[in-house]
From Swiss-Prot:
The gene is acsA. It catalyses: acetate + ATP + CoA = acetyl-CoA + AMP + diphosphate. CDD domains: ACS (cd05966). This is Acetyl-coenzyme A synthetase. HAMAP family: Ac_CoA_synth (MF_01123). The lineage of its organism: Bacteria, Pseudomonadati, Pseudomonadota, Alphaproteobacteria, Hyphomicrobiales. The keyword Protein transport does not apply.
Length: 651
């Protein structure tokens, strides 16, 4: 753990919405009087019919979660219509294309017309309240229009990341029995086309074999690339929207009506359809967006995620737009045309708040500082991190090099299931420790539990649970409430189990140590892989590291490290560097963490969202590379061949 403490910056304190005193006061109120607290903050969104009930939740038995259950509202209305009077001409979405010379600005009034037209197209083709619509689009404005159009008419959207394979798309279409798909001819990423329409056609054929028939496909023309056409089924978006009205009344929605399904992989079985509902989700997404990012009217906010992930739902679309913010959507990748792209976009659009993932930061850090320092980044005020624990070395680089020591970093912990950020610093209230997500957001009760279910008090290590509900929490697994209870509420009775390990320090700060299934047991000692990875990455030659366990004849599990080197570091003698890294880890953590195998690799197997696929790394480490399972979601499947070829553990 990093011992360094970074006090709240004077500049952040000066203009903040929440200082430390306010944080402590509000947090105490949210614990002692959740009904009163959430009633007050529930009014941050507009209700067609105000709620009289606030919290009705039970983590035992059949697990019911209801918030604002008698209130009536509409998410699309809250994200668009209510802003038209005061900020109709304000930019709602800045779209930055994959090509650095292409961008577009969409005002709230233009957003209204685009969303209403798309909503009317859906209605024209028979989509009704409660129907599931699958959205398989690249990061273009139409992705946001599609989500908001579904919300407007009460259809439930299921966004599938445009990097997923036809098989993955088909599985998601089948699971929620979706009959309407919105896609594009092609996507563009890093200058290369992605065959979305072709993938959609394949997925529809696969779904049909499982008796789910897609009736209509709305196709956005992104590249003008050639596509095959299903007569009577396929529709051009640009033709359809031209023939409908730019006005559509928002459907009155009960607070507990479904808003969206988003599939997330579990440790077992097929992906789970995480179901989020209307009222509580929007209250929580908008409130966390405002206070975690200390958002002030007029600022330019950029979350680099994709709408195919929950971060894109909550912090590109719903949270920012509910707050009347200007949100930036980026179609491209961090390293195209080169590794300076993020910072050039920051300068070009005068970005004030920047929210990205540690995996991107580590890759950019490995490319060298000059890609960062050639930009001014003078408009940046706040930096954020999401998706996985950020190792202290990447945190320090982000703070010192990207932020020039003038931007607080909000290292946020949350999950698809949570709807919004649960543990996080607040920039004007929280002293920072590199690598720590620090303190819980309002209304969030973290509990550390040992493997026997005993609650750990004070300084402790344990399994991270949340002991009471918050408005943004998922309500069920779509079509499988039993799986919902088994996955999240059966391990520790009466608590939501996150699946993550965590440490609480003497200041009450929380340190996420990685998935509990990523914990190694070395000679009877528990070690989080994140700790070993962090130690490796703190070495000046290492850009990125992933650590897994493998069967060891003496210790039970051995430590197998995959290491990607900094540019230029591969000139060293590999055996010498291995010895150096072993000593470095021993020094950082202790002899118990001595790596057994270190394999140098040009890249790690990652999904297109940047998550490292540890399952594949485990199999290679165990020499079971015949059983790698599905590798179709990998960004670069060629990486796997290199890993197998050069594995350190050949039998």
């Amino acid at each position: 753990m990093s011992e360094k403490l970074y006090p709240v910056l004077p500049e952040a304190k000066k203009n903040t919405l929440i200082d430390n005193e306010t944080y402590l006061e509000w947090y105490e109120e949210s614990m002692s009087d959740p009904d009163g607290f959430w009633a007050k903050h529930g009014r941050r969104i507009d209700w067609f019919k105000p709620f009289t009930k606030v919290k009705n939740t039970d983590f035992n038995g059949d697990v019911t979660i209801k918030w604002y259950e008698d209130g009536v509202t509409n998410v699309s209305y809250n994200c668009i219509d209510r802003h038209l009077k005061s900020r109709g001409d304000k930019v709602a979405i800045i779209w930055e294309g994959d090509n650095p010379y292409i961008d577009k600005k969409i005002t709230y009034r233009e957003l209204y017309e685009n969303v209403c037209r798309m909503a009317n197209v859906l209605k024209k083709h028979g989509v009704k309240k409660g129907d599931r619509v699958t959205i398989y689009l690249p990061m273009i404005p139409e992705a946001a229009y599609a989500m908001l159009a579904c919300a407007r008419i009460g259809a439930v959207h299921s966004v599938v990341f445009a990097g997923f394979s036809p098989e993955a798309l088909a599985g998601r279409i089948v699971d929620c029995e979706s009959t309407f798909v919105i896609t594009a001819d092609e996507g563009v990423r890093g200058g290369k086309p992605v065959a979305l329409k072709e993938n959609t056609d394949t997925a529809i054929d696969i779904a049909a074999k499982q008796y789910v028939m897609v009736n209509k496909v709305l196709v956005v023309r992104r590249t003008g690339g050639k596509v095959s056409w299903g007569r009577g089924r396929d529709l051009w978006y640009h033709q359809e929207v031209a023939s409908v009205e730019p006005h559509c009344e928002p459907e009155p929605m009960n607070a507990e009506d479904p808003l969206f399904i988003l599939y997330t992989s579990g440790s077992t079985g097929k992906p789970k359809g995480v179901l989020h509902t209307t009222g509580g989700y929007l209250v929580y997404a908008s409130m966390t967006h405002q206070y975690v990012f200390d958002y002030h009217d007029g600022e330019i906010y950029w979350c680099t995620a994709d709408v195919g992930w929950v971060t894109g739902h909550s912090y590109i679309v719903y949270g920012p737009l509910a707050n009347g913010a200007t949100t930036l959507m980026f179609e491209g990748v961090p390293n195209f045309p080169d590794q300076g792209r993020f910072w050039e976009v920051v300068d070009k659009h005068h970005v004030n708040i920047f929210y990205t993932a540690p995996t991107a930061l580590r890759a950019l850090m490995g490319a060298g500082d000059e890609f960062v320092t050639r930009s001014s980044r003078s408009t940046l005020r706040l930096l954020g991190s999401v998706g996985e624990p950020i190792n202290p070395e990447a945190w320090e680089w982000y703070y010192n090099v990207v932020g020039d020591q003038k931007c607080p970093i909000v290292d946020t912990w949350w999950q698809t299931e949570n709807g919004g950020i649960l543990i996080t610093p607040l920039p004007g209230a929280t002293d920072l420790k590199p690598g720590s997500a620090t303190r819980p957001f309002f209304g969030v009760k973290p509990v550390l539990v040992d493997n026997e279910g005993n609650v750990q008090e004070g300084v402790a290590d344990g399994n991270l649970c949340i002991s009471d509900s918050w408005p943004g929490q998922m309500r069920t697994v779509y079509g499988d409430h039993k799986r919902f209870i088994e996955t999240y509420f059966s391990t520790y009775k009466g608590m939501y189990f996150s699946g993550d390990g965590c440490r609480r320090d003497e200041d009450g700060y929380y340190w996420i140590t990685g998935r509990v299934d990523d914990v190694l047991n070395i000679s009877g000692h528990r070690l989080g892989t994140a700790e070993i990875e962090s130690a490796l990455v703190s070495h000046h030659s290492v850009s990125e590291a992933a650590v897994v366990g493998y069967p060891h004849p003496i210790k039970g599990q051995g430590i197998y490290c995959y290491v990607t080197l900094m540019t230029g570091a591969d000139a060293q003698d590999p055996d010498e560097l291995r010895k150096e890294l072993v000593q470095h880890v021993r020094k950082e953590i202790g002899p118990i963490a001595t790596p057994d195998k270190i394999q140098f690799a040009p890249g790690l197997p990652k999904t297109r969202s940047g998550k490292i696929m540890r399952r594949i790394l485990r199999k290679i480490a165990e020499d079971e590379f015949g059983a790698l399972g599905d590798t179709s979601t990998l960004a670069d499947p060629g990486v796997v061949d290199d890993l197998i070829e050069n594995r350190q553990n050949k039998k």
